């Protein structure tokens, strides 16, 4: 048999295997352990957060409504329901987020979320190659008792102006921005912000 024919055949076979493997990798779902469901965002996006001292640009703006899956793949919609909202955007691989979650949960356990406030964790920037994946296992291990939603494609984070973790957005009952914060908040500051929000 012609040597060149054998070489050409081997090249074709190698390419075919590479294509087959490539298709398998591309078609593989993100992860079977992640919640499933469509995320939708409606309304004008908030400007990207710059700093606490320079955030007047967002204060008073109406935040977009959104729907996303919870840890049980049930679609939850965040919209006007008569309650104010405290949203904390978390990345499972973020060390600051890993410190913040138990601080917030301890406050909830000891004092409780004030009446009239929905406290919502939004897991975003999900990466199965990094620490604490999947995020719902991490939150379960931390004993998180409040609503948890999954921003699988970072659509909600983008719409809310996230640029660092952890990222807090406080909304009044009409979904207008009251305050935004980034970084670890001490437990007393978390409490002050929640109480102030309840008194809006």
What positions do the PLM features span?
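Extracytoplasmic
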Residues: 61-63, 81-82, 114, 163
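Short active-site neighborhood of thiol/selenol oxidoreductases, capturing the structured segment around
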Residues: 76-98, 104
